[in-house]
Amino acid sequence: MGNLLVVIAVALFIAAIVVLVVAIRRPKTPATPGGRRDPLAFDAMPQFGPRQLGPGAIVSHGGIDYVVRGSVTFREGPFVWWEHLLEGGDTPTWLSVQEDDGRLELAMWVKRTDLGLQPGGQHVIDGVTFQETERGHAGYTTEGTTGLPAGGEMDYVDCASAGQGADESMLLSFERWAPDMGWEIATGKSVLAGELTVYPAPPVSA
């Protein structure tokens, strides 16, 4: 019996050595390195995606925590952008989110009911001169509380600060939600993604 145990022990020892040798000699498959990603790519910042920023999300900016009450999705041809109604400051604020040439563009907007302007030409507001940069016609859909219908079409005119030494972060916007309606005016300021902290919206109920 003792000899049998010795034989079994020797056999197991030899088998272990064989397995070890095979494992050492087996060529290792090099791991395929993952490609490095653009840190500024739109999809590299999921906190600003349409699924994360929506009714119920929290946006922290400038020491103020805002709640997203509603969202508007705009579509013009292949282009899509969003505006989110924020509640939490002294006045309702809108956060616009869009992608331009792979860069994420964000801006905070305040409606200006005190201005009776029409699109076209230059406008001087609060000491800043604005010049038209773009205009168009887009379809839109809404979610949550926005003060707008569930969907429709609208016209827009975008302006930016003009002149030598102008602050390029200052913005002006005209929006019209029906041909027989007046223009809504808003002034805005560009913000960087790093200036915002976003706590995503709860998932959409099935």
Curated annotation (Swiss-Prot):
It comes from the Bacteria. Keywords: Membrane, Transmembrane, Transmembrane helix. It is found in: Membrane. The keyword Membrane applies. It is a single-pass membrane protein. GO terms for cellular component: membrane. It holds the Pfam family DUF4178. The chain crosses the membrane at residues 4-24. This is Uncharacterized protein Mb2628.
